[in-house]
């Protein structure tokens, strides 16, 4: 036996008064005991919330505001929760022993509305050892715990192996899982199902007989018979569809001409607009493509112009930069020319001053010689004067001396004095204070040697003086020359410097002689260097223009290649015009041919459309006119054959219909008259007696009775003998058999059964042999089998007849279509396709246009290449003669070398030019420089000093000699005083003295006169020297200025500078000319770019507008095409012949059709509105909608589902052809589909009986239920009187109301509603339609009335009403009804759920104190018998003997409110055990 699922426990987390509380639920009754406010209702509210987490339903009424018109906003739930995360969880074990924890996470939402957020979830696979509180709480310490959020709970469960956590976004999914796992009894698919479930729980919770339940017990207990209703609805829909089809066929036939006109005009109206939009779209696409091509071309042109602009700007920048450098170079060259000219003028001044200096030098030298001669003469005069003075002085001395030596004594005295004087003089002269006469001899030798040395030195100096005196003037002149050339120098270095200068002068003269050749060579090399630089520039420019770097070795080959290319390009360019002319001529011919084909295309397309229609209709492909005529002959023959076969099939079909009608007679009577005769004779047809014979026995009995199988069995033949007289309305052979119809058997014949046959012995002399018929029709099974086969044959025959009729008509239409085609289109239909030719020619035209564009582009490129090649050849022509220059890599080095040598030579030339004369003058007198010009004076001084030294030495030697000679005189000291005189000697001395004085006077006069002359000569010399120095200084300044100018002032410098300036001027002019050209070209390019930019902007704007228009049109067109394809009207609208009409012609065609359509749809409101909407030119899809609406209208009118073509015109023609056949077929189908009213009544009666039996079975479970005075409870089900009458009429008196059920205008439901109104005219139906009422009457539940009855005391069975029962009795009665509902739900849901699951049963009861102990015991017994769990709440004065009781006490401790819970299991003498699971974190359990 399958165990029923149970609720194990209820867990409340963070509810008001319950932080973490788990209530273990008893298998039967769990009692919550406590005073007011203890938390009983909160606990039950938590259970209900976890069971039905729907905020639209939850409403705990004990919090309802008193006197308010509506309940509290939070419906009593918000106030039962604490802030933060709250949980309510149910721990269950289902029939499969699976533990499932379901629950909800609740959280208060801040705000005035006091809302609560609810999230349902489920946990599967949880081990039994894990308590629910352990899942959702986290212990922080011994006294604190934290509630986990839903995400944290999910993460925690994900870590547990085998545990599945599911969170639900919808209550339906939550309840679906609970139903599948056996937690709830019914699958709650919708909000109404949840509402029923909640109302049941609410009725259980608050007790009593719920009016919401009792008023709608039918919805709770009686299942909906949707299959029967759907069968009726399908039948009615089929009948309605048949009737509508028939009506539509008739209406379509009557509206045939209107529809043809409507189709034709609608097609013209929409197809013209459709093709106009297609043409415009193609034109717009072509325009957009043209715009895009032009845009791309303009972009390419703009890009080319931009590249050109960049190149020209870059070249202009280069030229601007080059112009600056050229201007600087030109200015530098001009300045250089000016400097050269200035230098030349300076050079001329220098040369002029040098000539003046040379002249002054000559005069100065001459004056120097004059001054030197005068000086020499002055020296001689001074010597003569000095000699005269000395002679006078000597004579005076001698005269004095000789005057003293008058006698010997005087002489000796004089000699002694002289000796003393001589000794003193010797001491003084010899600087020998210790000199004595005795040592004088020794000193005499010494001083004589010194005298000899001084004499030799003096002689040497005299020799030098003689030489120096001769070269004195030359030395000064040479020294001045060396100083002039070399600059200031030491006089001692003059000789060496002069020799170096002379040697250098030789080199300088040699170098100066090379100036002109070097200058010519440098000029030549500079010219070659400039040519080389020009060639390099040309090569770089050439490579730049060619876009490739070339080696020098490749230039000649490139030149030949470019010449060959020029030749080939010249030929190509010359032949391009002819080729372009040929292409344009072919293009014009193609255009003319295309125009001709476009005029012929519509006629050919019309012929092809007609030919394609013929091909589609006949399924043949025609390639020539002969095949068309041959096929027309075949059609005529086929038409004749089809007509013959159709007539044969029609005859066979009529025979089958007659046989079916005969076999369909009631009781198996093939003749309807037999039934009337059987009733008349009071008998029964033999076929009706054997109506139940099996299909296997049917052949035997058919053969057994033979022709008498249609006999009538009567009780007594004698009683009908009189009735046979005058009987005319009967078959030709009427068989009558006597027998009891209730116990008739086949013993009336003697029968021998053979193989597949019988022999019937009718009499002794009459036997009948009958074989078993292959198709027996005796008995209902045989007849039905035969009728079924006949029906199948009839279907085949009907289909075949319809096919043949259709084929005949189709053949006839084909014949007419072929005749029209031959008359109108045969001449052009088999010509070549002009559109294919047009496409080919257009492709060729596009190729020609592309070829022309390519040709123009190639021609332009060839011209550009030709020009580039010519420019390249021109550049190469300038480059090739200079290849040797380009290959000369040492030219610049040679120029630098020659420049250096020229600089040296020019420096030498300037040196020679400046100092050549000085060097020429210096060369013959250079030898005089061996003696320093300053040493002449030194030499004179040395000579004078040597002469003085020699004189001194001589005087010293003479003095010493005199001392030595006078050694004897020192002994004449006594004669010193003795004087004597010699008058003669004195007189001679006096005469010589006078002569000497006279000579001295003459010498002095000559000296004075010559000194004046020397002074005059010296003044002239000083003037010349001053003039020379001035000019020399000016010359030096000019030379310094020339050096400062820094240019070579040679003869060709000015010409070279002028040539360089002219070259730079030419380059600058060329550069400026090119720059002006580039500026003009750049301006033109910028203007062209601006024009292209404006054009590009306009093109982009036009292109974007056109593209936007194309895209918009494409979107609309896509919508149109999608609508066209979805509705299958593309073939009708895409008429290719209209593509060759202009937009005005198509618009005119559409307007004409529109005018005709307005008249055609004037009476049809829908089509008129759609047509009015379709007139919007901006919404072409509305025309398609109109066209679709027209065809939809036609389909609705002509029933497209039963014809064999999608062409409305053909459909109308086929409808006319097959109208009678379809009418007959649909009528018979309606008769087969139509269900009899008696069958409907039987179905409803059987359903009612089945449900009454089920309710009776449910009542058996409530027989022993008693509450107070209520001894028993039952559910009474009765059929309403009005509906019972309806059932009776439907089953027995339906013939009286055939006007309702046979009406083609009423469905069966409507006819049923009309019958109900006819039977019950007193009932007001309100605003409900007959269809709605009829559908309600087809639901058996509306036939039943259900009410709850109780057997109470002496009153017997009474209707259970709250007013007639006490509170406890009402509670018990309501609980019984709810148990019945739950059990009914389980029975109903058993087929939807697994057979191995028995769902949990649990109900609530609040305030159970109103029940007495007997009633509570009854509840316990009911729970035990029905395996139901019950949760009841009661104050402290109720103590059930069974189940589990929780004592709840709400306490406040330190401003914290909590509920103290103690769990007890039953009452017994021993101490009850404390229930597991009641220990919590906030409140300990207590046992009592």
UniProtKB/Swiss-Prot annotation:
Descriptive protein name: Chromosome partition protein MukB
Gene source species: Salmonella agona (strain SL483)
Renumbered residue ranges of the record's region Flexible hinge: 666-783
Function, as annotated: Plays a central role in chromosome condensation, segregation and cell cycle progression. Functions as a homodimer, which is essential for chromosome partition. Involved in negative DNA supercoiling in vivo, and by this means organize and compact chromosomes. May achieve or facilitate chromosome segregation by condensation DNA from both sides of a centrally located replisome during cell division.
One GO MF term attached to the UniProt entry: DNA binding
Family listed: Belongs to the SMC family. MukB subfamily.
GO cellular component, one term: nucleoid
Domain comment, as recorded: The hinge domain, which separates the large intramolecular coiled coil regions, allows the homodimerization, forming a V-shaped homodimer.
Biased composition (Basic and acidic residues): 1051-1065
A biological-process GO annotation: cell division
UniProt xrefs under InterPro entries: MukB, MukB/SMC, MukB_hinge, MukB_hinge_sf, MukB_N_dom, P-loop_NTPase
Keywords carried by this UniProt record: ATP-binding, Cell cycle, Cell division, Chromosome partition, Coiled coil, Cytoplasm, DNA condensation, DNA-binding, Nucleotide-binding
Subcellular location: Cytoplasm, Nucleoid
Region (Disordered): 1049-1074
Matching Gene3D superfamilies: 1.10.287.1490, 1.20.58.850, 3.40.1140.10, Immunoglobulin FC, subunit C (1.20.5.420), MukB, hinge domain (3.30.70.3500)
Assembly notes: Homodimerization via its hinge domain. Binds to DNA via its C-terminal region. Interacts, and probably forms a ternary complex, with MukE and MukF via its C-terminal region. The complex formation is stimulated by calcium or magnesium. Interacts with tubulin-related protein FtsZ.
Biological classification of the source: Bacteria, Pseudomonadati, Pseudomonadota, Gammaproteobacteria, Enterobacterales
Chief place where the protein resides: cytoplasm
Coiled coil regions, renumbered to chain: 326-418, 444-472, 509-602, 835-923, 977-1116, 1209-1265
PANTHER family assigned: CHROMOSOME PARTITION PROTEIN MUKB, DUF4476 DOMAIN-CONTAINING PROTEIN
Chain sites annotated for binding ATP: 34-41
